[in-house]
Amino acid sequence: QLALQAELYSVFNSMTDGDNHKFSKGISDAFKNFVDSGKPQTTDSGSIPTGTFTGASTDGSMTSDSSGCESIIQTACEAMVDGSKSNDYIAEKIAEGLQDLTDGTEVNTSVSGTTVPPVPPPPTIPTSGSAKGGIDCDTSPVEAGLKACFSAMVDMTEGGNMYFASELARLTYTCLTSGTVNTDGVGNLEGSKGVGNAS
C-alpha cells in the first residue's frame, strides 16, 4: 500500500495543468504494478481424473493489463476539459478503470495436496499441479471513497496531492485484498477448483 501511495504521489507531483495523459497513464501504471505484486492464496478441492483432490496454493502470481484502464481515465479527463463534468465523474471513471483492470487480471497458482484415488488406484496419483483463474473485485467503495476524497479536497490549500495519493492507495488496497480469487485446476488437476484471496 505504501509503495502504491508513493508511486501515485510521484505522478501527481510531476503533473502540470492539463497533463491528462500523464495522469491517466500514471494511475493505470500504478494500479497495474500494485495488482501484479499481489500474492494469491487459494484452498483447492474437487474431483480430478485420478480421484478426489484436496490442497492449497503454495505460490502464485497475478498479471494485469493497464491499457483499458488508461483509456477509460484518459477519455474521462478529456471529457472534463470544458468543465461540464464534476469531480464525481472522474471518481466514477477511475473506479471503472480499476474494475476493467481487475476483471482482466490473470491468476496463476502452484498447488499441492493429497489425492484420494478410486479402487483400484491409477498408476500415478498427483500431489501437486497448477491452476489458473482470476479475481473478482468490487470497486464501488473506491468510487464512493474518491467522491468523498475530492469533496474534502475542495477547501484544501496544501497537501492535496498527498491526501489524494494516500486515499486512492488505501481504497485500492482494500478493494484488491477484499476480492475473491477463483481458479480452475489444469492438467492433472483438471476438475479441481480453488477459492481464496490476494494479499
Language-model regions: role of each:
Residues 1-199:
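Extracellular "spike/adhesin" assembly and maturation modules
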